[in-house]
Structure formats: C-alpha cells, structure tokens
C-alpha cells in the first residue's frame, strides 16, 4: 500500500479530487417527485470591493444547507447574485477613473472577483443574478410602477440622514451618538425630491407577522425589530434618489433612480422569472423557503421586504434567519473599513475543505464569532489532524494488517447500517 505523505498539501490534492467528483456527477441527486421544491436565496453582496472571509462564510453555510437538501431528495434552487447599483459604487468608480459598469464588471468577473471566490469555495449555486442584468432592470421598473399605481408610492421631499456605506436612511432619533446605528460610521445630511413607499400602512401586518408566526428567527431578532423599529412608529420609506444616476431609472419620471434596496430585494423574484421572460420557474420556487441574512440587514428583510411583497400581493418567504457576524479583533469585517481576512490566502495555506469545515464547526450560527488564525489552526489540528487523522491512520493500518490492504465487496446490510441510515434520514 502506498505510504501516506507526512504533510498534507491541499493545492496538490483538492482541485483534482473535486473535479473528479464533478465529472462523475457526485453532487447531483435525483429529486423525489413527492417532495416539494426547496429554494434558498442568498442576499446579494454590494460590489464596492473584493469580498472577504465573512462573505465566504455566508455563502458556504448556505451552500452546505443546499447540498444537504439535495441529498434528502429535494429539487433545490440555490440563488446567488450581486447588488451592483447605488451611490457608493458610483463614487468608487469615479475615484477609480472608470465607469460604474466597468467597476462592477471587474469586481464580479475580474481576477479574484466574486465568481472566482464562489468557484474557490465550491459554492454550488444554481443561478447567479446581477442587478445590472437587463431583464432585472426592466422587471424592477415594472414593479416600481405597479406599487406606484397601487397607491403605495408617492412623490415628496426627503430630508434626513443617510449612511452611504449601508445605503440606509435614518432619522435623527435613530442615530447612536450621531452615527449610523448599523455600522457606527458618520452619516450625511440628505435633502432631495424623492418617491416614498407607504411603509407605515403595513406596520400592523408586519408586526403580526413577526410576533405571531415563526417568520423571523431567532426570537431575539423579533424583539429587536419590533421594539426598535415598529413600536416607535414606522415612517414611510424613501425609495428613489435624484442626487446620483447609477441605478435603475424610474421610467415614468426621468431623473429618479430606484432606491438600491428595492432593486436588490426583488432580485430574489426576478431571477425566477417574475415580471420578465428570462426564466419561468417563479411559481415553482417562490416563495423561498429561507433567507439567511446578516443581522445588519434583518430590518430590510423582515420589515421592508414583507411590506413591499404585501403591496405587490405576492407570497412572503417562509422564513428569515438573522445570523451573526464574523468578527476580526472584535469588530465586524468590512470592505470599507479594510479589516478583512482574505479567503484566497487561507485556502492556499489550509485548503478549502478544512476552511469550510472550520466555518461550519466553529461559530454558532445565530451569534457573532471572532476569527483568528490561531483558532483556525487549533480547530484543524484538533478535529481533522488528530481525531479524523488518527482514525484514518488506524483504519488504514488495520486494513493492511488484517485484509492485505484491500477492501472486499460487502453483500447485504447489517443492522448497524440500517440504524445509521435511519439516523441520517431523521436529520
């Protein structure tokens, strides 16, 4: 029997083995026709810069659930994409001396861009949408017009505070020490003609949704949304901008572009064919079974998103789960702050499989987790090198000693096989 190497070099092994699995359709399962389709839609990252380890963790956790559901026999739609409009992208492009479209193209499709990162981390998404895609832009214009025609969007003047990094509007009373309550950064004064969505109209229905159903999880997120946003009084939401141009144009009022969060949220439906002819599986995969979202965007997905769907008379997603942050030195990883960990460097050093295992094994999903190289190394040594490595070493040694280094075909199953299969099916 060939002697195992003393040191594991992931670059020499993982890509070759993973490609072999792909070539043999090892990750494809035959859907059970008796099971309803299952859909998981990932919040599209805003493409203001290269993604970091926090994004890789977000995608990996959702990919793992997707693969598990496929193994259970579900016909799964795993949707990912990118949020490519907004003022901060326009500003970043200007500073880089390129057009906004060139800027986002490079972040998405360029070397070590988002598509490369998804490939690196073995993300098995079924579809990828860019909010600059023509079919999505046209669908958003139709959606905006319909909410306007329904009487839920009206023109006025916005005057208040705006956090450019978060693309969020705030009132003076919502600020924390005069700064954005989500990211803690400076806000700027904003005053411009704008369209507003009647968010206040749906306050009671949204509160009932949060308090009386299991729509939003965990329960701590429900208390936060109700006590911090709904009970103080929901104000109507500014849903268009006139101070910049990089966005979906409001087709019936030149000069206005659709607020980036309206644009981004509806990608979950347009990517399935809603209000467009690009795809035709909206009825099959909507409503989504689950949204996994970072806690900083729970407000958008549990208050604003349901209200707009109610306005459109569309089904609501079944569940929204607000997960914690991946922290570095006690603070949230942020592209704009520059406190990020490069997933490319980590994967080259430790391997993608070990990295995916570490992310799933180490951090409680609903809570924040503080990343460090020491924690990653200890987890790999303890669980993989020591526990799994020792098990493999002893198994190979016994196989060599007692069976001449060969594994013979086993006829039939034993009770322990049936018991194990039952346990897996009950997960």
For the regions a protein language model found, what residue spans apply to each?
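Acidic, turn-prone loop/beta-hairpin segments
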Residues: 83, 403-427
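Bulky hydrophobic/aromatic "packing anchor" residues in well-ordered structure
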Residues: 83, 111-114, 206
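A broadly conserved sequence feature marking short terminus-proximal activation segments
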Residues: 103-162
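A charged helix-plus-loop insertion that forms the helical arch/lid used to bind
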Residues: 92-108
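Cys/His-rich short segments
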Residues: 150-207
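Structured secondary-structure scaffolds
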Residues: 1-80, 135-139, 183, 189-401, ...
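Short, charge-patterned binding micro-sites
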Residues: 82-88
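A glycine-rich phosphate-binding loop feature that marks nucleotide/adenosyl-phosphate handling sites
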Residues: 85, 160-166, 324-326, 375, ...
């Amino acid at each position: 029997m060939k002697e195992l190497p003393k040191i594991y070099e992931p670059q020499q092994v993982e890509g070759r083995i993973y490609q072999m699995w792909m070539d043999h359709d090892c990750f494809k399962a035959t859907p059970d026709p008796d099971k309803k389709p299952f859909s998981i839609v990932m919040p599209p990252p805003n493409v203001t810069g290269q993604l970091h380890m926090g994004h890789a963790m977000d995608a990996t956790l959702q990919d793992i659930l997707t693969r598990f559901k496929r193994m259970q026999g579900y016909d799964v739609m795993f949707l990912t994409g990118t949020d490519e409009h907004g003022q901060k992208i326009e500003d970043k492009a200007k500073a880089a001396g390129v057009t906004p479209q060139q800027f986002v193209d490079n972040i998405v499709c360029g070397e070590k861009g988002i598509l490369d990162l998804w490939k690196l981390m073995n993300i098995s998404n079924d579809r990828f949408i860019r909010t600059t895609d023509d079919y999505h832009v046209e669908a958003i214009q139709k959606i905006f017009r319909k909410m306007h025609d329904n009487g839920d969007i009206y023109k006025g003047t916005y005057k208040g505070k705006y956090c450019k990094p978060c693309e969020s509007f705030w009132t003076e009373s919502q600020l924390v020490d005069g700064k954005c309550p989500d990211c803690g950064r400076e806000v700027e004064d904003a005053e411009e003609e704008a369209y507003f969505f009647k968010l206040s109209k749906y306050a009671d229905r949204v509160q009932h949704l949060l308090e009386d159903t299991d729509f939003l999880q965990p329960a701590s997120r429900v208390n936060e949304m109700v006590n911090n946003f709904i009970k103080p009084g929901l104000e109507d939401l500014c849903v268009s901008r006139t101070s910049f141009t990089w966005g979906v144009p409001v087709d019936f009022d030149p000069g206005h572009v659709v607020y980036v969060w309206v644009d981004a949220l509806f990608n979950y439906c347009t990517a399935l064919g809603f209000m467009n002819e690009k795809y035709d599986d909206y009825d099959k995969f909507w409503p989504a079974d689950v949204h996994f979202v970072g806690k900083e965007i729970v407000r958008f997905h549990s208050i604003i998103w349901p209200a707009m769907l109610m306005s459109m008379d569309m089904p609501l997603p079944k569940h929204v789960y607000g997960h914690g942050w991946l922290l570095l030195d006690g603070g949230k990883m942020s592209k704009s702050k520059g406190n990020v960990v490069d997933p490319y460097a980590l994967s080259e050093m430790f391997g993608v499989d070990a990295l995916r295992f570490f992310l799933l094994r180490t951090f409680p999903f609903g809570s924040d987790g503080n990343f460090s190289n020491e924690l990653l190394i200890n987890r790999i040594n303890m669980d993989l090198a020591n526990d799994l490595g020792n098990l493999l070493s002893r198994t190979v040694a016994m196989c060599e000693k007692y069976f001449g280094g060969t594994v013979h075909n086993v006829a039939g199953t034993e009770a322990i096989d049936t018991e194990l299969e039952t346990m897996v099916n009950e997960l």
